[in-house]
Amino acid sequence: MEMSFRWYGEDDPVTLENIRQIPTMKGIVTAIYDVPVGEVWPRERIQQLKETVEASGLKISVIESVPVHEDIKLGRPTRDVLIDNYIQTIKNLAAEGIDTICYNFMPVFDWTRTDLAYEYPDGSTALIFDEEVSKKMDPVNGELSLPGWDSSYTKEEMRAIMDAYADVDEEKLWEHLEYFIKRIIPEAEAVGVKMAIHPDDPPYSIFGLPRIITGLDSVERFVNLYDSKSNGITLCVGSYASDPKNDVLEISRRAFELNRVNFVHARNIKLGEGKSFKESAHPSEYGSIDMYEVIKLCHEFGFEGAIRPDHGRMIWGETGRPGYGLYDRALGATYLSGLYEAVVKAAK
């Protein structure tokens, strides 16, 4: 497997030079962040991004994400032109040698948390999701925005888009996803690109919106939409584990058995009451996920793709983009690499 690290471009306080100094680090997970959702990523912009990353001694491992326009998720008549644009972006990325694209099909919101700076007793801060707090949040107030999101909305825009989803239940969303998949995957397969859908985060309905990539059954249903290695998943163990009903190791094993794991996000979370959870340090003892067993599965199934430490705590006085500081994610990367070395040597 190839250790990689999320980088948010030139505006990211974590620099490529910082990232390169992390032991075993090989790849960068990044995107073009200023092209409006739904428009084609120009090939020259992709070339510039690639040159910037490679000048640091690293390479682009994965594009995360090429956002999916809401009109595609809503099944609106405009979706065909938007899907054409999406396909052209896939082709442009492939032409620059980029072969893995992470994306999601979450309506309106990307990953959602209720507190970006929950303080642990040791003074570190982390992202958390409190189920009871979430029930009191009103997304229509226009103030809800998180660091991982591709779009932010005014009150009027939010009200309109939430109203639009009133007629879209889970089955309708599945229909719209299937339409999208059957358009893009043959094109991705033809140019050697592996698509990797990210699970919903958290993997259950919030704010009355449908969520469909949520657990074992949905993974199996998803891969059956189109039979191709290019129609794969991002195995984000922290997202799947956020629902206490999910057995994340069972989901992981099944996804590997199906040969559809195209990218891995490895972060730990600590389950709380109901569906509440806190993001934790990566080592198993701090969370609810046995990270050793996750890495063991990666080795057992010969996973050679990119893996990245996911959200980290803010430690040692660091400030910046919540969840995406340098220090704790660097610790996570070295921990994961240590687990991998141990697994490989134990298997000999």
From Swiss-Prot:
GO BP of this protein: D-glucuronate catabolic process
Swiss-Prot/TrEMBL catalytic activity: D-mannonate = 2-dehydro-3-deoxy-D-gluconate + H2O
InterPro entries per the UniProt record, alphabetical: Man_deHydtase, Xyl_isomerase-like_sf
Pathway(s) this gene product operates in, as recorded in its UniProt entry: Carbohydrate metabolism; pentose and glucuronate interconversion
Keywords: Iron, Lyase, Manganese
Pfam families listed in its UniProt record: UxuA
Cofactors demanded by this protein: Fe(2+); Mn(2+)
An example molecular function term from Gene Ontology annotations: manganese ion binding
Enzyme class, spelled out: lyase
EC number: 4.2.1.8
Reported function: Catalyzes the dehydration of D-mannonate.
NCBIfam families: PRK03906.1, uxuA
Family assignment from sequence similarity: Belongs to the mannonate dehydratase family.
Listed name of the protein: Mannonate dehydratase
Organism of this sequence: Streptococcus uberis (strain ATCC BAA-854 / 0140J)
Upper taxonomic lineage: Bacteria, Bacillati, Bacillota, Bacilli, Lactobacillales
